[in-house]
Swiss-Prot record:
This is Ribosome maturation factor RimM. The keyword Translocase does not apply. Pfam families: PRC_RimM, RimM. Keywords: Chaperone, Cytoplasm, Ribosome biogenesis, rRNA processing. GO terms for cellular component: cytoplasm; ribosome. One of its GO terms (biological process) is rRNA processing. An accessory protein needed during the final step in the assembly of 30S ribosomal subunit, possibly for assembly of the head region. Essential for efficient processing of 16S rRNA. May be needed both before and after RbfA during the maturation of 16S rRNA. It has affinity for free ribosomal 30S subunits but not for 70S ribosomes. The keyword Transport does not apply. It comes from the Bacteria.
Length: 163
């Protein structure tokens, strides 16, 4: 079973064990089960409730009944079986589908590889490792994910690639 990273637990919400999950692109609203990866441990859990709450998803899972339990999972990756996920939609992407993709400019200059993503509140940010070191590239209109070619193409505004 191939697992895809669909988000990350970024905080506890409320007192009843809801997890604040960033980056799910709506997938959590359709899943019955998820896998949580926290450190080296992976555990599958039933999704009891999932609803949008601002830029996050408030998710309640089996086995987490209070805020303390939810706080213990902050930092955990949320994964789902690839076969249970539909397409993320036009202009939307599952985080796991972006990790590992090469990043190039529209001129063809290689910038590096997507090694991670950050949820910042306003827009998700690609973490790109390359010859220039680590670059942070916001998923803004000047970034195109070319699924057919399996790469990310950036038309960087002035200053984006400066150290």
């Amino acid at each position: 079973m191939a697992l895809v990273r669909i988000g990350k637990v970024v905080r506890a919400l409320g007192l009843k064990g809801h997890l604040g999950v960033a980056g799910s692109e709506g997938a959590l609203g359709t899943l019955e089960r998820v896998v949580l990866r926290h450190g080296a441990a992976e555990v599958e859990r039933k999704v009891l409730e999932a609803r949008p709450q601002g830029r996050l998803w408030a998710v309640r899972i089996d086995g987490v009944a209070d805020r303390t339990g939810a706080e213990a999972l902050v930092g955990a990756e949320v994964l789902a079986p690839r076969e249970e996920l539909g397409e993320a939609g036009e202009g939307r992407h599952y985080w796991g589908d972006l990790e590992g993709l090469p990043v190039v400019t529209v001129q063809g200059e290689a910038l590096g590889t997507v090694t991670g993503l950050m949820e910042t509140g306003a827009v998700d940010v690609l973490v790109v490792q390359g010859a220039r070191g680590e670059l942070l590239v916001p998923l803004a209109p000047y970034v195109e994910v070319d699924r057919a070619a399996g790469r990310v193409v950036v038309d960087p505004p002035e200053g984006l690639l400066e150290p």
